[in-house]
């Protein structure tokens, strides 16, 4: 299309009937594309792109058909002993977030937790994933109280639910994780329905005390791995996320799913590396698992 338009501008001396032909061709191409449901745009960026807006990290892509993914990043840094504790009075540790760099492909953030912990985030958008590389440092002379933290991806639009609906669980049938080595749609079996705060669902891995997770209903089953996700409204795409190390998998009340990452309480002077992924890929689960297992070899699948 650009070639045709350049052709028109560079040949102003041609007879009028010759100039009209390319324009007719261009119009025909655009009309045919519209009839087929194809969106024709100029210079459309390839892959995913990022925007930092207040406390949200926004993921955009032409593949999302206008449904951007908004991630509350980070929602909270959290203390241990959180499963049956007051979320505000006990669990959440205040923090501030400073944007160091904000471009469409790379965002750098520095978080300062009120107990002195400093966490530097390097977030990079790729063709069909967002990569997270975190460095947590405790420059103080006391152990940090931050044992885990949560990024909250809001996925209602991606899942295709009615934005006017007041049913905050309407997206749950689109959500999944892995139990007994197989994909399990939510609500899974033995869905827990009692907790300090309702509704929601938490899955705790074997390496984390069951007293140190989100104060929502705690499922009795242990997840097979650290991957959790949501199918798109038409089931053609999957949003999935994982972190290493991870604290829990969580289906929440903001039409969200979390793979919350683990800090473990850094000792004085200690530094830790944390990494994470968001995948926005075709709904080919075997291929997704292969990719996840390559990215997170530490996450051995349990059956």
Residue ranges and their predicted role:
Residues 125-180:
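Acidic (Asp/Glu-rich), glycine- and aromatic
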Residues 40, 99-101, 110-112, 199-303:
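Beta-strand-rich recognition/accessory modules
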Residues 108-110, 120, 131-135, 273-277:
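Beta-strand secondary-structure signal
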Residues 22-35:
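Bacterial N-terminal signal peptides
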Residues 80-127, 147:
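Extended, loop-rich substrate-binding clefts of extracytoplasmic carbohydrate-active enzymes
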Residues 166-216:
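Low-complexity, serine/threonine/proline-enriched polar segments
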Residues 43-96, 103-104:
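Acidic-aromatic substrate-binding/catalytic surfaces of carbohydrate-active enzymes
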Residues 1-20:
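N-terminal secretory signal peptides that target proteins for export/translocation
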